[in-house]
Design a protein with these regions (language model features):
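C-terminal catalytic lobe of FAD-dependent flavoproteins
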Residues: 71-115, 121-221
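Flavin (primarily FAD) binding-site architecture
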Residues: 55-70
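Short beta-strand to alpha-helix junction loop
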Residues: 1-16, 26, 129-134, 197-206
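A conserved short coil-to-beta-strand element within the FAD-binding core of flavoproteins
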Residues: 25-39
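Short, conserved active-site loop motifs that form the nucleotide-linked donor/cofactor pocket
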Residues: 22-24, 193
Length: 221
């Protein structure tokens, strides 16, 4: 169905393709520090020098640069989106625009169950990325407002939340909700450091090509 994806499976597919292409992946490896001069200090390898560093850490990209005293002209707003998995499967796929706030909420068949999402809540990196009771009731109310069969907390078999990094300059103060803001990414080059701000799965291939072009233009490769 349109409007849904299995990002975990897609991420694992990309990971496996990267390994086949010769990429070394170090999971749960803490980077203690990095500089715009290409230096990285990690708990496993100590200090190492690289031709280029690409900071593509998603919601953490801006905070990592700030922690390493690297100035930037871009900042991120983090928007939490929460989803519910209900214990039955709806007969079709639906997109509803809520009259109260104008947001779009989807209700879709998902692995034999029903997926309901998403919310839009601004949050900080220091906060837990979890579905709150307020979000839970919001999504249940959307469902119950559009279907004869009503559901409650007892029908929820799973829930998950994620963060959308949105470049702050893409938000306009007059916007009443975040989904109308541009999800396009920005890239910034500071010496030997390239940082990716924002972005999304659907534009990831073109974004990676853009980063490679920047690498070549700076004669890193």
């Amino acid at each position: 169905y349109d409007a849904q994806m299995d990002e975990e499976s897609l991420g694992n597919w990309v990971r496996e393709k990267s390994i086949i292409a010769g990429t070394e992946i170090f999971e749960e490896e803490r980077v203690e520090r990095f500089t715009s001069r290409g230096e990285i200090t990690s708990s496993r390898f100590g200090r190492r020098q690289y031709d280029v560093i690409v900071n593509a850490a998603g919601p953490w990209a801006a905070q990592l640069n700030e922690n390493n005293e690297i100035s930037t002209k871009f900042y991120l707003r983090l928007i939490r989106g929460s989803h519910l998995i209900l214990d039955h499967q709806v007969s079709g796929s639906y997109l509803f625009q809520e009259h109260q706030d104008g947001r779009v909420v989807f209700i879709l068949p998902y692995l034999g169950k029903t997926l309901v999402g998403t919310t839009e809540v601004s949050q900080l990196l220091s906060e837990n990325t979890i579905c709150t009771e307020e979000e839970r009731q919001y999504l249940l109310n959307v469902y119950n407002s559009n279907f004869k069969r009503h559901v409650s907390n007892s029908n929820i078999i799973s829930e998950f939340s994620g963060l959308r990094p949105i470049v702050a300059s893409h938000l306009r103060s007059k916007e009443s909700y975040f989904s109308v803001a541009s999800r396009e990414a920005e890239t910034e080059v500071v010496d030997k450091l390239i940082t990716v701000y924002g972005g999304k799965w659907t534009s990831a291939p073109s974004l990676s090509e853009k980063v490679v072009r920047k690498l070549k233009s700076k004669e890193f490769l």
